[in-house]
Amino acid sequence: MIYCVLSTTPGTFWFPSGFDPKPYHPSADSKLLPLGLITLSACSTRVSATTRWSSFHATDPSLSWLTGSSPWLVILQGQGGSLFCHDVLQGRLYILSHSVSLFLKTGLRHCEAIYRAPLWRDRPLPSLWTCRDPDKAFLPTLLARSARRGLAAFYALWRLHLGSRSELSHPVLEWESTELVLTDWRRGRNEAQRDAPSVAEHFARCRPLLDELCGEGGWLPFAFLSTSPHVWLILTEGGPVLAVDVNDTSVWRIADDLELLRRLGSLLLLSGLRLPLRPPSGSGEAAGEPGYEEEERRGRASTASATAATSTRGPTRPTRVTRKGRVATGGVHLSARPESEEQTDGHHGRQESSDDHQRGGSGRGHRDDGAHRHANDKTEPQQRGEHEERKQTDSGRHEHAQESQVARRDEEETEQGDSERSCGGATQTYGGRGRHDSCPSIPLSVPGPDPRLWVPPPHLLFPSPLPPMTPVDDEPSVRPRCPPGPAEEPPTCRPRPPRPSSDTPLSAVSRPSAPPVPPPSTARVRFFLSSSSSSPSYSPAPLSPPSPVSPSSPRSPFIPPIRSPGLRAKPRVSSGHPAAFPPAPSSAPARSERVTSVPSSASPSASCVGKSQPPAAHTA
């Protein structure tokens, strides 16, 4: 027997460390008033004296067996009189009853924290989910364990035991037992035809509701009640087990998972809190109701009139009436409407009188004409109502036609690249138009090209494969970013000077002009000499123009590549201006000698085809 001690004296409130009762204050948003604390004990004798809250020992008979850090269950009361129980360990709120009088009868029967207590590890509760077949007595345990791994693992085991029958017992009313049949609702005609012949056909009414509640593909109906074939048990992706009544489309939770369902049995299945929810608008059930089309038509008309009233554009006046009776307003053809209802009624009356005049004499025609006029007077309110609804529908259709036409023109102007439009001038319609096509279009700004965005020239996207040298700055982040100048133009292929023979004197050979010597700087220069491969290593600078992008690379040229934090960024120097150094101080006269560069390709003419020839290095 389980006893509870309810402390309602404010002086005896003792909260464990880490527990804050402020969220339960009546001034909070939840509006839950704490009534007291519940201490659970599993002893054979009833606890009569209050326990000292200052010290707890393991041998204390009234020691709570929930957990050592938070041994309390807080009982709360809502505004409507419903009583709730907060499990501090799990952080969950359970509903106990809808009134205090009902709580005095049921007690903590519906408190699921009792059935999850760690005490049952030593003294386990009996399983209330059993199979009729003795050979499948292990099936509920295996299904509960497989559900911990998700719906895929549960489905792999569940589909092998379709058609198995089991029972759910009540924890208090032992004579109450509910039979379950494991089956698939999509194949309900085979397994459950004798019990529920129409379940497979009518279960689709709950699909929109379950998709909205659990997500598409996040639920699986695995069993139904043989005594009530319209009630199905559904396992969700997160673990909670739901019950769905396909007749009134109501949903309620019966357990947190299948492990708790084995201990609760049919407790919450028979006495749970049902939540009748209305299916989403536009579903099959709502569309089949009488008057649904009329309600939808009125809703579309009212939405169209509200959109027209709040529209920023002024009313469009008809310019002309075409031969087919349509009004042309700025390129949008709209149906012509009569100016007033009196003209419409008078027109019908004149047409009927002319028909009667053709049928018989003048006197009888006048009498019939009066009778028809009297009939028209009787049906005039009905015709006026239909005419007003037709006008509202037409106005909604006209408004949508105008919006679509304006959006189409804006998109065409945007595609043509009109320079007069600003960056956010064009608009486009957002949102699909399904069944509820009365939703107003939402104008969105179409982003244009940013003039502040620097677009690199083509020769920087595909530079020469062999840069001669790469300087490394001590502090590359301090140097400001400069726009590309004319110094970064691609080098051209220049013919190589003729090689002098051994008989030609040195004075007759034309010496190349020495490049300008830049002033000495603090930058270090690192040379990359590669004789084996034709493409040396290359690392771009973080503040230089973007790195080259190969045609096969999916990376955008405007996004800098990801570099390893261990490598140091090395800015690139244009290949058109080779770096040189001032001559070293020496007393000997300077003598120049030319070093010919070895081409990377075997063919002498292949170096000038699509590639820039690296200039020869001169040493002073």
UniProtKB/Swiss-Prot annotation:
This is Uncharacterized protein DR2. Signal peptide: none annotated. It comes from the Viruses. Residues 336-411 have a biased composition (Basic and acidic residues). It comes from Human herpesvirus 6A (strain Uganda-1102) (HHV-6 variant A). Residues 278-620 are annotated as: Disordered. Residues 446-470, 481-500, 542-551 have a biased composition (Pro residues). Belongs to the herpesviridae US22 family. Residues 278-290, 301-319, 501-512, 522-541, 597-607 have a biased composition (Low complexity).
